[in-house]
Regions:
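Acidic, proline/glycine-rich low-complexity IDRs
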Residues: 89-135
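Short, extreme N-terminal segment that most often corresponds to the first beta-strand
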Residues: 1-29
Length: 135
């Protein structure tokens, strides 16, 4: 199976891995970078994705194992990626370069899996292709 992860070059403090797209845009909200309208849209989008994309249970505990999530390159995973237009637009507007890491091997030890994604600990990035996300 193929897996992909969309992220920035910024390394997250907790995971010590590149920060993912959801957290990146969340940080724009936290820093009050977005306009009021964009912030309102962010909360609308976030509510939607929390409804349609399962939230791995370890997030309720603050992600104690420092897991990172990867989308499965399946119709379900691609559908979620295609719906992330707002997130991509905010990154572009605020000058944040997004990267897409892709691998055909498990990118670490899987601790969670659903139809859309996997979550891994102890990431192994030796067979990952990284490219810049185009619009």
């Amino acid at each position: 199976m193929k897996y992909f992860r969309v992220h920035t070059s910024d390394v997250a403090w907790l995971t010590k891995q590149p920060r993912g797209i959801f957290t990146t845009v969340g940080k724009l909200v936290d820093s009050k970078t977005l306009t009021e309208e964009e912030t309102a849209e962010y909360w609308k989008q976030r509510e939607y994705f929390e409804r349609v994309l399962p939230v791995p249970p370890f997030y309720k505990d603050g992600n104690p194992d420092h897991a990172i999530t990867w989308f499965k390159d399946t119709p379900q995973g691609q559908d979620i990626w295609n719906q992330l237009t707002f997130y991509r637009q905010m990154c572009k507007k605020y000058g944040i370069t997004l990267y897409k890491s892709e691998t055909t091997t498990l990118p670490g030890q899987v601790i969670y899996e659903d139809d859309f994604q996997i979550a891994v600990i102890n990431p192994s990035n030796y067979q990952v292709l990284v490219s810049t996300v185009k619009d």
